[in-house]
Amino acid sequence: MTTGDCCHLPGSLCDCSDSPAFSKVVEATGLGPPQYVAQVTSRDGRLLSTVIRALETPSDGPFCRICHEGANGESLLSPCGCSGTLGAVHKSCLERWLSSSNTSYCELCHTEFAVEKRSRSLTEWLKDPGPRTEKRTLCCDVVCFLFITPLAAISGWLCLRGAQDHLRLHSHLEALGLIALTIALFTIYVLWTLVSFRYHCQLYSEWRRTNQKVRLKMQADGSEGSQHSPLAAGLLKKVAEETPV
């Protein structure tokens, strides 16, 4: 996780209010001087969420340690051994984090999650906004393949027709040269096609291995709610005790 100019594990926040990289984002929110400005990113640098928490905004309950939102739209879970504010997380946020980081354990307490991984399809790889150089190379290779394939076929056919004509005229040396040229042409074409195909297959296989769809295996929905209720009660009690009357 990258937080401003600092690096922390998911769920931790650092004071980056003086960072010039986020000054425009802070001014646009209208929250005044921020207490925390945090960006949650995956290992490959993709931004997962940006969080700005103001000094005047008190914490009125548990929130997700990844997206830093409460349990308004989705219930919070405590699937690992983390306690306190780091123990609550949305199921969808955790699944997205595990998929982006290509891990199956909590990076704080190292608890192994029961997950189900499913590989992504070829169309998802083509639509993925990954490195532009890979997509550009793929487009260039496809265009070259569509252009070179008919060109190689026509050139080989013309060379063989010329070799037949020279054989009728008893010009064996010229016919042998045209046959050798045809063999060399098709050898180069086949080698280039195989190398390009293998290169892109390796890229696709690596992408599928590191970008799998992760589904967190929990018990029943009722147990998820009961699993979180002690955590929520403890946090609310702690906040109530620390709040001056």
From Swiss-Prot:
Residues engaged in binding Zn(2+) 1: 64, 67, 90, 93
Segments crossing the lipid bilayer: 138-158, 175-195
Annotated binding of Zn(2+) 2, by residue: 80, 82, 106, 109
Substrates-to-products reaction catalysed: S-ubiquitinyl-[E2 ubiquitin-conjugating enzyme]-L-cysteine + [acceptor protein]-L-lysine = [E2 ubiquitin-conjugating enzyme]-L-cysteine + N(6)-ubiquitinyl-[acceptor protein]-L-lysine
Zinc finger (RING-CH-type): 56-116
GO cellular component, one term: cytosol
Required for interaction with IKBKG, as annotated region: 121-245
Protein's recorded name: E3 ubiquitin-protein ligase MARCHF2
Location of the protein in the cell: Endoplasmic reticulum membrane; Lysosome membrane; Endosome membrane; Golgi apparatus membrane
GO biological process: antibacterial innate immune response; antiviral innate immune response; endocytosis; positive regulation of lysosomal protein catabolic process; protein ubiquitination; suppression of viral release by host
SUPFAM superfamilies from the UniProt entry: RING/U-box
MF (Gene Ontology): ubiquitin protein ligase activity; ubiquitin-protein transferase activity; zinc ion binding
Function comment: E3 ubiquitin-protein ligase that may mediate ubiquitination of TFRC and CD86, and promote their subsequent endocytosis and sorting to lysosomes via multivesicular bodies. E3 ubiquitin ligases accept ubiquitin from an E2 ubiquitin-conjugating enzyme in the form of a thioester and then directly transfer the ubiquitin to targeted substrates. Together with GOPC/CAL mediates the ubiquitination and lysosomal degradation of CFTR. Ubiquitinates and therefore mediates the degradation of DLG1.
Keywords on record: Cell membrane, Cytoplasm, Endocytosis, Endoplasmic reticulum, Endosome, Golgi apparatus, Lysosome, Membrane, Metal-binding, Transferase, Transmembrane, Transmembrane helix, Ubl conjugation pathway, Zinc, Zinc-finger
Pathway(s): Protein modification; protein ubiquitination
Protein topology in the membrane: Multi-pass membrane protein
One Pfam family, short name: RINGv
Entry domain remark: The RING-CH-type zinc finger domain is required for E3 ligase activity.
Subunit structure: Interacts with STX6; the interaction promotes MARCHF2-mediated ubiquitination and degradation of CFTR. Interacts with MARCHF3. Interacts with GOPC/CAL; the interaction leads to CFTR ubiquitination and degradation. Interacts with CFTR; the interaction leads to CFTR ubiqtuitination and degradation. Interacts (via PDZ domain) with DLG1 (via PDZ domains); the interaction leads to DLG1 ubiqtuitination and degradation. Interacts with ERGIC3. Interacts with ADRB2.
Keyword match Transmembrane: yes
EC number per UniProt: 2.3.2.27
